[in-house]
From Swiss-Prot:
InterPro entries xref list: HMG_box_dom, HMG_box_dom_sf, SOX_fam, SRY-related_HMG-box_TF-like
Gene3D superfamilies: High mobility group box domain
Name of the protein in its database record: Transcription factor Sox-19a
Organism lineage: Eukaryota, Metazoa, Chordata, Craniata, Vertebrata
Keyword check for RNA-binding: no
Entry-annotated residues carrying Phosphoserine: S160
Length: 297
């Protein structure tokens, strides 16, 4: 019984070994077959042999070949670029008679090169230059006009109050608007100077603009009406500048205007000065006692 089992086991082992050998042969064939296209692709990628051919040397290269070696031995720490600069300077100092043998040697080498490689064509290689970072003008000139305008635009449409006070106008305005603002500020200064020259006319204008203060010593509110600075500056332009009778000449039209104002508030009343004073006294009593005046009914 044991002999039969051993016979069965021995008979079962060789087929597995043969199958393993067959698999290795198949794998080997596959790998061998795949290696051939790789070799062919490398052969196809091989560049033209003419690309490896060097250009023939010119006269300077023929002369500098020996001089470069000599200078490198004398100065072992010198860089190759520095050696080339010095050799170029020395080559320019040579006379035509000294350059003649090297020029003839360069012609001979060129003729030999054309004979060996008749189909040779020089194909210069383009060197990739590193992209240089452009200098930012804003970094160089932080206080330029363009940067100031950009900073003002970033603050919004309102602009900077400091810039507006100097007559620049709103942010982003056109040059015409800016010139108008500058001209307006100059006009204000001109009116201001004229007001300083005529203080009596200035006082009369303030009295006309705030007529209630001339009749009523008390102010009706904590914030009384005050003439705007622009109107107080512009008003002296309209007043006659006669130095002799300026104040007496203006009282007539001013009183007429006050009568018109009184007639607006007190309809049907007398338009004389006494009626105006009674109307203002009644108004004062109204504000003091809180009762409505009945004289105008």
């Amino acid at each position: 019984m044991y002999s039969m089992l051993e016979h069965d086991m021995k008979s079962a082992v060789p087929p597995t070994h043969q199958s393993a050998q067959g698999m290795t042969q198949l794998n080997g064939g596959v790998t061998h077959g795949s290696a051939k296209p790789a070799v062919n692709s490398q052969q196809q990628q091989s560049s033209d042999p003419m690309d490896k051919v060097k250009r023939p040397m010119n006269a300077f290269m023929v002369w500098s070949r020996g001089q470069r070696r000599k200078m490198a031995q004398e100065n072992p720490k010198m860089h190759n670029s520095e050696i080339s600069k010095r050799l170029g300077a020395e080559w320019k100092l040579l006379t035509d008679a000294e350059k003649r043998p090297f020029i003839d040697e360069a012609k001979r080498l060129r003729a030999l090169h054309m004979k060996e490689y008749p189909d040779y064509k020089y194909k210069p290689r383009r060197k990739t230059k590193p992209v240089l970072k452009k200098d930012n003008p804003a970094a160089k000139y932080p206080l330029s006009a363009g940067n100031l305008l950009a900073a003002a635009a970033a603050q919004g449409s309102g602009g900077s109050p400091r810039m507006d006070s100097y007559g620049w106008g709103h942010t982003g305005g056109y040059p015409g608007m800016q010139t108008d603002a500058l001209g307006y500020s100059q006009q204000l200064h001109r009116y201001d100077l004229s007001a300083l020259q005529y203080p009596s006319a200035m006082a009369t204008a303030q009295t006309y603009m705030n007529g209630a203060n001339s009749y009523n010593p008390m102010s009706y509110s904590s914030t009384p009406q005050q003439p705007s600075p622009v109107m107080s500056m512009v008003k002296p332009e309209q007043v006659s500048h006669s130095p002799t009778g300026a104040h007496s000449h203006q009282r007539g039209p001013l009183q007429g205007d006050l009568r018109d104002m009184i007639s607006m508030y007190i309809p049907g009343g007398d338009t004389t000065d006494s009626g105006a004073q009674r109307g203002y006294s009644n108004i004062q009593q109204h504000y003091l006692t809180g009762t409505a005046p009945l004289t105008h009914i």
